């Protein structure tokens, strides 16, 4: 389940017209949501509020054998709708199968303001900060839109227990809908990187066409440790010829590590989705088959289940709403031994107004 601040961030992206479907890092978004979903640990309570249309605050208290907490603030130049945990659509905070938005050349008109017959691009921004206690770890994020296709994202973390005291990462992102690319730099090992994605079979004048083939890749290099890395991937999105249900297939490859991963995700019905993933290493010949599914019992209740056969791990999660409070509870365990070993168990409560 997304946190309140994550929901506000995605609302900012939607309001500013930024589409995340073309980000290479989110190419396997659907399978990750259905297989690698996060299970809460301990007991956590989060209280958040959008005090004004342009600012929000959030307070979290967690018990993991010892008390931890965090205080977060967010400010944006855009006026955002006020979410209330009692009326919020649960589908927006519980990620599952993600159906890609159609590519339309006219979907960025509202990003431009016309003055004197000349276009003036809106340069909206978002600033976020969070302080974790008692570790005194500070996290910050800055998002700045320069024009309808370009965005700067800056993230940083600072703490005495971190290597070099923290790290700063910059992402220069450009999304032209037909293709997208981003450049990144991180002070951690002086990392330099580039990512790109191109969509084939796209007709801007016919956004209703469901099929789409996306091909992308990334390359990065750590200057200090002289360590390169790269990966390539493709994603095919279409609809089932028999049921009309949307489905997504992906194939990713890391040639340096010899790792291949293929996924197949399908929305099996109005309230259910299913995903499988097969991982294979060409050097060690090790493989793993993972499966995950979600079922919505109602608009206010969802069950998730995933398992990996080689790792012999399983996860069970329930997300729902009790009155005006969002509840997220689950358990993860390892069934490889004679007695199943619980690796994570917890419950989260969220209230937002």
Swiss-Prot record:
It comes from the Eukaryota. GO terms for biological process: establishment of mitochondrion localization; mitochondrial genome maintenance; mitochondrial outer membrane translocase complex assembly; mitochondrion-endoplasmic reticulum membrane tethering; phospholipid transport; protein insertion into mitochondrial outer membrane. InterPro entries: Mdm10. One of its GO terms (cellular component) is ERMES complex. Keywords: Membrane, Mitochondrion, Mitochondrion outer membrane, Transmembrane, Transmembrane beta strand. Its main location: mitochondrion. It is a multi-pass membrane protein. It is found in: Mitochondrion outer membrane. Component of the ER-mitochondria encounter structure (ERMES) or MDM complex, composed of MMM1, MDM10, MDM12 and MDM34. Associates with the mitochondrial outer membrane sorting assembly machinery SAM(core) complex. Lacks alpha-helical transmembrane segments, suggesting that it resides in the membrane via beta-sheet conformations similar to those predicted for other outer membrane proteins and porin. Belongs to the MDM10 family. Component of the ERMES/MDM complex, which serves as a molecular tether to connect the endoplasmic reticulum and mitochondria. Components of this complex are involved in the control of mitochondrial shape and protein biogenesis and may function in phospholipid exchange. MDM10 is involved in the late assembly steps of the general translocase of the mitochondrial outer membrane (TOM complex). Functions in the TOM40-specific route of the assembly of outer membrane beta-barrel proteins, including the association of TOM40 with the receptor TOM22 and small TOM proteins. This is Mitochondrial distribution and morphology protein 10. It comes from Yarrowia lipolytica (strain CLIB 122 / E 150) (Yeast).
